[in-house]
Amino acid sequence: MSTKFSFTPSQDQAIHQTGNNLLVSASAGSGKTRVLVQRVIERLKTGVGIDQILIVTFTKAAAAEMRERIQTALRQELAVSQGDSAQQQFYLRQLNQLPVADISTLDAFCLRLLQRYYYVIDLDPVFRLLADETENGLLRDEVWADLREDLYANDDSGLFARLTENFSGDRNDQGLADLVQQTYTFANATPNPTAWLAELPQPYQLDSDQLMTTSFYQQRLRPFFQSQLQQLQADLTSAQALANQAGLDKQAAHVTAVLENVAAVQQLVTGDSWNALRAAIQDFAWGRMPAVRKTNEDYPIYNELKTTYYDPARKQLDSLKKTYLIQDEQQAMTTIRRSGELVGELSRVVTAFRTAYRQEKQRRHVLDFADVEHAALAILTQDSDQSRQVAAQLRHQFAEIMVDEYQDTNGLQEAILTAIAEPAPQGNLFMVGDVKQSIYRFRQADPTLFMTKTDQYAADAAAGELIVLAENFRSMKNVDDFTNLIFKQLMDRELGEIDYTGAAQLKFGASYYPDTVTSTAELLVYLTEDAPESAGDADSEAMDATFQVDNKHQGEVLMVGQKIQQLIADQTPIYDREAKQVRPMTYGDITLLTPTRTNNLIITDELRRLGIPVVVNDARNYFKTTEIQIMMALLQIIDNPYQDIPLAAVLRSPIVGLNENELALLRINQRTGDYYQAVLHFQRSFVPNQASDFQQAVYQKVSHFLEQLQEFRDIAQQDELVTLIWRIYQETGFLDYVGGMPAGEQRQANLHALYERAKSYEQSSFKGLFQFVRFVERLQERDDDLAGAPVQAADDAVSVMTIHGSKGLEFPVVFIMDASRQFNKQDQQGNYVMSGKTGIGIDYLDPDSRVKAPSLQKLVTAQAISRASLAEEMRKLYVALTRAESRVYIVGSHKTQEAAISAWEQAYQSPNLVLNATLREKNTLANYLDWIGMCLVRDPKFAAELRQGTTTFSGLAGDPATFAVHFVTAHDLGPTQGVNETAVDWLQAASETAAKVTTPPVDTEQLHQIMDFRYPHQAATATTAYQSVSEAKRLFEDPDNATIGEYQASATGQVGGHRFVTHDFARPDFLQTVREPLATEIGSATHLVLQQLDVTVTPTLDRVQGVIDQLVADQVLTAEVAQRIQPELILRFFSSSVGQQVLAAPDQLHREVPFSLLMPARSLFQDFQETDSQVLVHGIIDGYLTTPAGVILFDYKTDHVNAQNQAASIEKIVERYGGQVNLYAAALKQMTGQPIVGQYLYLLAIGELVAVPEQQVRRLSE
């Protein structure tokens, strides 16, 4: 291969052509990124600056890679431009501007747009990006909970109750909540969510009294019926032709009669009577096909026409009858009308939810990614001069807009790009992608945008031009041939949204591969029901006694593991593209691609058992790991111990260590009630002198656990979540314990990841343990695990990742795992189906009969979604196959070899190269393995290897692809020998090793010195060097004991630090309903008013109220808090002796004065022996007044004063805050150098000034 890359004619066209919009269809391995980078360089050579090009990528990683590649290319151009100073200066400028160039995801570009042009749409520029989807979901849940209550309360028509009943179960209304959230998500992917929601009921609006003359039937249902009947007619016509050719006259006549009946039904489809059409299909006269004996020489042809054409046609019509024609016209129209009422109510509810959610985000100053994109579109397109100016400015700025992975954009993103692009025929959009690799439908990606442009540019050259990059420079020829063999039979416009013909097929371009390297494509099929053939053999019997495959997933992985061992043992040659040389295959060359993450734990466990190093790049089984399940169970019972399953999990775990018998004892002790009550009852009713040793042991474990649980519950109420988690790790030793387990380093990394996730969670708008548990539950529901912190893995290890995760990557050897897994059809089931294009289709629950029936709108929408889902599955398979450079293995399972081949031979029903749509859609064949099997079974090479004399398809006779199909049983796998010995062998080896180890004699005196060592400054380690006054004030609460605490180590060696924190925490917002302002909030507000009040003039009630009103207007105070402030008590302060002095000398008043004071630690902690240890005390003084005689200190307090015993209550307040005032006084004395001539507490609750005894000041400051 030459050092300089030479471009193909189509690549060169994509690099240099300008003047209009360009759509580049770049197949897998076609070098699209290289083309993009080179196009940027060529554009720069024409004088366009890097700041004049907008490059939009699908991911941040892709943007970073693009920026890096452009930087490398620019440096190369700079190197070759030596001697041309002007050119060098230009390239240097581009390099300098590259870090701030517009190369990013579209989200990031929109965010920059908002930060720059927020004023165009009156957006508050101070906002936080709600990037965590789980936090976003929790916030939506809160908003929905509040809105739902309002909707119930104001449901005068009862329509909302009907909506709830229609979509929710008997226990809760979660079904409706899920529907609202999903509808909201679909709406947000459109350029105009409000309009999309408003149009949802439109398909249910019947504009005629006859169903078949309505717009819905004419536009949606009739075309579907016609296509189904045309397919049916085509099958019967093929059967008729086959019968005529073979001289089967009776059969031909029978099929002809059936065809006449089909023609009659087709006429009714275009008529106006639903009931007539329904009756014709329900009573369709198939008659009986004349039989042919199996001994007759014509039987094979008869069997072919019947099984390949006639029977499928009959099943197709039967499906229409049972699915679409259950109800008569009146019933169907009633269902549609009533369903339309519910859809209209849903539209109203989701619109209300959007409004409420937007308001809540505004209140919290947050935006999510959808908000950012919609706001960007509003900036560019709203009807205002400013918007038009911004759009024009951006169109002028960007000479070209490059969009990578265009097939994964949605309608909203398309609208944004269109708003800043030059319109055709001078278009400046350069879009590159491959519709065959569009696999993000679940993110609302719309591949039809790509296809629409393809068709548009083909029809109108002025609109733009299509360029196809078909050469695959990644894979060996057989990988290309095998992929083409599959997809030319599988993918077409009808079902795959693109015809896999001509330019869409892969063309071999990687001619640099040497002939010494072979390329293979193999099916590895594990047979679940085939028994060992040599069961009577003694060796087999011995093997079976020790070896067992528990399930098909384990069997598949063992099959793959042994294949990998074989490849490595054989030193299979591969071509190293980076080193440009042939070398033996290593584990690092092999990647396992999975359709989901479900079986990743099985894969890793089995491969490691075989001694195969493995790393899971996107494991996402984090919450399934033992250590995390135990920690989450513990957090659940700390939040609420009355949960049996989490409690049992913790008791059984190493944290407590109860076994099954001990757990049973607790339940036997109290057979009724929840398990936590049984645990408590056991502890409380325990009588030591009547207990057995077994019971004593259980009691010790349970008592210790309950003590820890109470301690953890206290921490959860008083401290941060991360403090709780770390305390659990320390107190239980669980973090250290898992480090000693297999894969201990990874397990510890997982626990650290939980801590870090809790830390980031608390930086969001949610707090507390309860919400964190909900947060994690939502992560699990979304299958969005916290992936544990990565542990450095060996470079030479097999990789495991999902197909989605592999997109854009390439590997020498690929195993496509779990290929027989049935496709997920959840989005086509349930009470409703939804599509961004066709809207929503629902089941209607009749409130009287309690019968639920699907609306015709649902059936049509479900059919469209089914086809879109199958098309996406085809694209996922295409992505998986095209990741391979030289070898690809498809791994799945079947019951038996005969069952597998029999299923695949249904492909013989297809007379054309592309398999019949009915076969590709068939539920029992809806998986990768059967799709591929059907594509291979018609190939002559398959028949030659596995099915002698079977029918093949002539169109595949010369196909160049080579492949192999292997069927494997559990007997074939046999017992596998991994690197791990049995427990007995391991212990024996460990014992032998230990026996050989010699140790020096122990110096017992030195050992005692080590064990008895006590750090001389132990007290300092338990004392924070920083104390706030609010923490230190308790120093003086007890006049007889002027100490905060006394150092004492616990039994575990843990030390309680010398620092006091408040135990009075505000009730979290999420637990409040209609809440009253807290006393602390009112107190803080009152302080603020006193701070803001102008004392240069005599205060009045009106002036005090004016300050309060202004603070409310500035949104510093809420109206509820403001109403609880008492202006007359504030005013009364200025009638006191100190208040009068303040008014007399306002320029000597100092308010809200912060201070920091270094104090000897011994003055705070009596157990300190060090004389030089100091503590920094920090606080804020409410106010002080300087006078010629000295300083007068005062502090406002809003504490309640007991009117029944006022003197005692005041005395208690003075004792409580005396220490705090004394600290203030000591600080002021040091700050001002003046004596303290008075110190007071002003009690706002009663409007009185109270003196603090002066001797306490002297005691501290001496």
Swiss-Prot record:
ATP binds at A26, S27, A28, G29, S30, G31, K32, T33. One of its GO terms (molecular function) is ATP binding. It catalyses: Couples ATP hydrolysis with the unwinding of duplex DNA by translocating in the 3'-5' direction; ATP + H2O = ADP + phosphate + H(+). CDD domains: DEXQc_UvrD. Residues 5-476 form the UvrD-like helicase ATP-binding domain. Keywords: ATP-binding, DNA damage, DNA repair, DNA-binding, Exonuclease, Helicase, Hydrolase, Isomerase, Nuclease, Nucleotide-binding. One of its GO terms (biological process) is double-strand break repair via homologous recombination. The heterodimer acts as both an ATP-dependent DNA helicase and an ATP-dependent, dual-direction single-stranded exonuclease. Recognizes the chi site generating a DNA molecule suitable for the initiation of homologous recombination. The AddA nuclease domain is required for chi fragment generation; this subunit has the helicase and 3' -> 5' nuclease activities. Heterodimer of AddA and AddB/RexB. NCBIfam families: addA_Gpos (TIGR02785). This is ATP-dependent helicase/nuclease subunit A. The gene is addA.
